[in-house]
Every structure is written in C-alpha cells, then in structure tokens.
Amino acid sequence: MSEGDSLLVTVPDKNCVLGDKLTAFAPHTTGIPFGIDKELEIIKQMFDCWTLLQEMDDYQTVEAVYDHVAQVEAGYRGLSIQPKDVLLDTIQSCLCIMGRNGIRPDDYRHYLTGINAIQGHIFRGRINGENAGMLACEIMYLAACLLTKADSFERVSDPEAYKDFAFTLKGMKRINYIRSVDPMAYAYLVKALQLLQPQGYFTDSIL
C-alpha cells in the first residue's frame, strides 16, 4: 500500500488523441515529413486516425485539440501557417493516396513505401494501395469538417444515397474507381467535397 495523498491524473481520451494525431498526418506542414525514412510512420498516423475516427464521440473536443496542437506544432517548426493550411495538407495527402500515383506521384511513392511496410504492424486485415484510398476518404471528410468549421461530423448511414453524385473536376477520373469499389468511402468523399466547394476549395481541380 502506498502512503500519502492520491494524485488526480488527467489522461487524454480517444477524441483528444485523434485531434493530436491528425496534425501528424500532414507531411508538408506539421506532420512527419518525407525524406527521413519515416514513410511507415506517416502511414501509421493515417491508419491510427482512421481507427480512432471509428470511435470518435466528441467532435468538438477533436476540433479544439486539433486547433491547439496545429498552432503549437507550427510554432515549434517556425512555420507562419494557420490550422487551415495543415488541414489542406492532410486533404491533399488523402487525395494523393486515393489517386494511386495519378495525383502528386512524387508524394505517392513515399506513401506507397509506407503502405507496403505497414503490413506487419496491424493485427487484422491488410492495407494496400487500393483500400488505403478508402480509409483516406473518411479522414478527408473529417479534415473537411474541421476546415469548413462544420458543426458536426455526420456519419453516413445510407451510402446508396450518394452513389449518383458526380463531380466534373479535373483529375476526378483518377479517383472515380472508389464509387464502385467502396460506396461508403465514396459517400464520405462526396460529403467532403460538398463541404469544401461552397467555400472555394477544389472547385475546378483536385490535382
């Protein structure tokens, strides 16, 4: 038995951890950068974000933690950027992974190295070039919610309601395969673009 007064320790919950980890999946800003042999870590951040997103139950906490951590990390790196710049980095990263070498190929080779390396680090299922893009759709939607200051993260209950949505954007053909491969992932992609376009993002091209 220990003696003395008990200490109250505050432990970050899943929502806090998600907000924190999302800032690390932004290789051109506050995240783990390319070129330092950390490609596996970059993909692990993406996978962790997707896994935590399945359990997220407090979007406002994710939003608050993300905003704080993004600003702290930017300051630590001496970057004159705002959280919105970090979120755009994450969104572009998601699109790159969806594009499978068709969008930002120089970046994709780094992601693919991480995707190939992560197989021995997950306990169930497999991640490959195709289904990594499916995970990226949901992460992109979360980033879009944060970027556009959405009031909530709306989970998709009926993916069939989104299957007929189409976007005439340059580069869209490179990710249209998602519609037939994974209707749920495509629904989140649609929801992300529906948030982003009215605010002037990706109105002409996703490249």
What are the residue ranges of the model-derived segments?
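An amphipathic alpha-helical interaction surface
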Residues: 149-151
